């Protein structure tokens, strides 16, 4: 926030674009409602309007019911079973999995057979969170390399991959060629 405030105060013109504006009730925390830094809202378009105009695609939600954990079963094992089952059912080459926490992603890839099950099906995988950084097929990479690879794989019709991301609706991520979320 201090960097944004600095550039905003020292620029002749400054514009901010976001699909998910963040607001704060206090001036100590960053919030796009702080007009001294961000200015007034010039234009705000609701997502349904953008969908109707054909500018963005509507979300297609496919619901899978979660079963109750078995005695002594780890949540990550159940998540693995459900995610692999969903990938098998939707039969798409490019899949985005949205997790509720970084811990959930880390548990899924480190404590279960998820990664080996993906490999068995011909999928690569990638993840990025603010806590862990970026990773592609188990190798730590820079953010730049992550997004370059994401775009490259997204344009490659033959590439099968899964992106694991935390809080996708609040952060946002753009995946070329994405077929299923």
Language-model features, listed with the residues they occupy:
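Conserved helicase motor "Helicase C" RecA-like lobe of SF1/SF2 P-loop NTPases
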Residues: 102-129
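Short hydrophobic segments within beta-strands
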Residues: 17, 96-98, 128
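Post-DEXD/H (motif II) to motif III coupling segment of the RecA-like Helicase ATP-binding lobe
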Residues: 2-56
